[in-house]
Each structure stands twice: as structure tokens, then as C-alpha cells.
Amino acid sequence: MKIRNYNGEDLQCKVYIHENRKEETILVSVPEIFFSIQIDYDIYGEALVEHIYLHLFNLLDEKEANHLALSIAQWTAET
């Protein structure tokens, strides 16, 4: 499991990322905003950012949701 610190304009939190290689999924959790999402390996790049953004948009303002989505996409791409 990876733990990353997110420091946005209005939100500072920890992001927990767990990779399940057997099921080819990634679980992302942000407890501070009661958010979690399971992502399949076949979603990546701009599609991944958009997918995460659409879920975060319900919880955060547009700018913060986009910035956090970009950060999560970058962190999940790390090997």
C-alpha cells in the first residue's frame, strides 16, 4: 500500500492506494472526505483522470476535484 500526502488549496489529506495484482484493480481511499474508488487496470491516462474527477465532483469543488484526480492518476501510475 502506498500512502501519499495531498496538499491542495482547500484540502490537505492522506491518499491510500492499494494495488491488487491478482484482480488487476487499484483501490484508492481518502478517508478525510469519505471517498473510495476501485479502478480497473484498463482505465488509464485522461480516461482515468475523468473517471476519478466525476466521482470527486460530488464531494469537492471543480478545481479541487480536478487537481486531486490528476494527483491520484499520477500516483496510481507509479510502479
PLM segments and residue spans:
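A short, structured beta-strand/loop element
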Residues: 20-45
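Generic, low-specificity signal for short hydrophobic/alpha-helical stretches with a mild N-terminal bias
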Residues: 8-10, 21, 34, 38, ...
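Negatively charged, low-complexity tracts enriched in Asp/Glu with abundant Ser/Thr
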Residues: 1-16, 47-59
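Intrinsically disordered, low-complexity linear regions
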Residues: 18-19, 63
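Mixed-charge, Lys/Arg-enriched low-complexity segments
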Residues: 42-79
